Amino acid sequence: MGKEDKTHINVVVIGHVDSGKSTTTGHLIYKCGGIDKRTIEKFEKEAAELGKGSFKYAWVLDKLKAERERGITIDIALWKFETPKYYVTVIDAPGHRDFIKNMITGTSQADCAILIIAAGTGEFEAGISKDGQTREHALLAYTLGVKQLIVAINKMDTTKWSEARFNEIIKETSNFIKKVGYNPKTVAFVPISGFNGDNMLEASTNCPWYKGWEKEVKGGKATGKTLLEAIDSIEPPKRPTDKPLRLPLQDVYKIGGIGTVPVGRIETGILKPGMVVTFAPSNVTTEVKSVEMHHEQLAEGVPGDNVGFNVKNVSVKEIRRGNVAGDSKNDPPMGAASFDAQVIVLNHPGQVGAGYAPVLDCHTAHIACKFSELLQKIDRRTGKAVEESPKFIKSGDAAIVKMVPSKPMCVEAFTEYPPLGRFAVRDMRQTVAVGVIKKVEKAAAGSGKVTKSAAKAGKK
């Protein structure tokens, strides 16, 4: 297959902190990945010097993580690996303290979640206990529209590759993911050792009893033996190129001799030079002079592309991180006066009532919003209302809440523009709730700034 023919997909790796996520992810990136041999050799040498030889795959990931946390410049190719069918990007390094926030504000939408479960005695039980991280992560993935799941049952070597233990874990995990919302029949369960490499890329000889995984897919069944094959059997995503443009800004740079360059990831639609874009909620309209990615000019940017684009006659003071760019002629973005959202309270020590005003992280925006009204309490499993106008909600509850941003922000309904329709509620330095936006009351549009070049381009 030619390099260009492969589809890009995003996976998110979830599971308990000691399940071996780093080692498993590191192994895939290491064996099929974007890390060049020189870097690997350098890492291995350092690991050996520090007596961490046994930890090499996780060590690779730790090095990458450290570099990523130091600055944004880390080559994102390092988080990629290739399968026969796909280019895979690992969206978040597991164990990252911002994992939940990242999942929701989602630098990108995952196409599939890989749940890593440790098979060791006691380890498995700890991972999916009632207060386990695993439950929270899986629930989060499902709520945020990650509908495909792979379960990798790791550290099988610690159970001496016991078939009975494997089957017991499948049974327990099936019940567990069913409660979250997944259908176990559509899930591949793969017994692996992320450290030794069993069933990662090649079928292991340590489990002669293992006949392979099987899952239901549209129009039939998929089967395979390894984790790599399970990743290859992910159904390819439909990318939202046909929707109107939405591009949340991550940063706005001023570049000498070029001018103002907003940077961000295209979530929906297409961005082309010559287009007239509107930034919300700043309400500034201008022409796009050029679009580039990785220092190369693009004829057009599509969803998933992280682009910089040059705009005319707009100063860096007028637009900022958290603004959203869209096509001025095709459902241009607008600020929100208020919005209704389905909110799930994850961990709040007290109870939440009307008037609560935490910070919301939605796409790249970070803005305080008031819970102005609790409309209904909802049964999380069925989505049906169980109480009208509740006074309070507490941890574990789901509710429809009317929210009012403290200053202008641009959000959308999750059904129309998913990446702009989900958010994390942050308070006391943690994620206390997550939400999905049901409907948006747009702010009355005042007359905004329209640059000369936009007016001219608009007449063309």
Swiss-Prot record:
Spans annotated as G5: 193-195
Region (G1): 15-22
A GO MF label: GTP binding
N6,N6-dimethyllysine: modified positions: K3, K317
Organism: Podospora anserina (Pleurage anserina)
Pfam families named in the record: GTP-eEF1A_C (PF22594), GTP_EFTU (PF00009), GTP_EFTU_D2 (PF03144)
N,N,N-trimethylglycine carried by residues: G2
Subcellular location: Cytoplasm
UniProt-recorded name of the protein: Elongation factor 1-alpha
Entry-linked SUPFAM superfamilies: EF-Tu/eEF-1alpha/eIF2-gamma C-terminal domain (SSF50465), P-loop containing nucleoside triphosphate hydrolases (SSF52540), Translation proteins (SSF50447)
Signal peptide: none
Region annotation G3: where it falls in the sequence: 92-95
Residue positions, PTM N6,N6,N6-trimethyllysine: K80
Role noted for this protein: This protein promotes the GTP-dependent binding of aminoacyl-tRNA to the A-site of ribosomes during protein biosynthesis.
Residue span(s) of domain tr-type G: 6-241
Region (G4): 154-157
Residue sites binding GTP per the record: 15-22, 92-96, 154-157
Top-rank lineage group of the source organism: Eukaryota
Keywords recorded for this protein, A-Z: Cytoplasm, Elongation factor, GTP-binding, Methylation, Nucleotide-binding, Protein biosynthesis
